[in-house]
Structures are given as C-alpha cells and as structure tokens.
Amino acid sequence: PIAVHEAPAARTWFGDARLPTVYQWHYDSFVEMPAGAQWLASSPACAHQTFALGIHLAMQFHIEITPDKMADWLAEPGNVYPDAIARYPDSVQPPEAMRAATARHQADSEALADVIYSAWRARWRG
C-alpha cells in the first residue's frame, strides 16, 4: 500500500483512501520533487509516490492495471523482471505474485482510478 498524506490536496486527489494498495514496481525513482509541488503519498519502496503541481498530478504507481495488461507486461520479450526481482526483492514481486495481487485488488484499484480520474477531469472543467 501507499500512505496518502493528510494534506487537503491529497484528499482532493484520493478522496477517503488512506492506505490504498496500488500496483508499484520500484527500482528507480526521483529524489526531489519540483519546486512548488505538494507531496501527496509515499511508501517504504518509494518516498515520493505522488505529488501535485498546479493542476497536474504525478504518480509513480499504476491505477490503470488490469489482469490483461499485467499478462501483456509479463509476456514482453526481453522483460527485465528476472533481474529486477533478484536485485530488488522488497519492491519487485515474482510474476505469479503480481498476477494474483492484480486479480485480488482489481475492484479497489478501479474504484481508486475513478476517484483520481474524476479529480483530474474536474480541473479541466474549471
């Protein structure tokens, strides 16, 4: 899971979600946020999971994941999963675990995606 911060901007983007489980696969990340960015969420694997900058949202996780997308990603020729699993076992799961978790968390992921996408669309109506 990621820890959604208590900032008003975090509530705007994430609604009532506090510790949502999201698809994250980390072995690389940025260390500093842009000037003026609002830090919205973090996790042990990635300190800067999400930030907002003006009307924009930056996420280092996937809310668009589905079992079919996961299957496509895992079937990609030359994929880097075996090396990443060996080098980053705390934040990169084996394919079997990714498939099972995707199916288990699909409904919650779709609900969170609806909240985030609705907040994003509201910025363009404005």
Task: List each model region and its residues.
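Acyltransferase
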Residues: 68-126
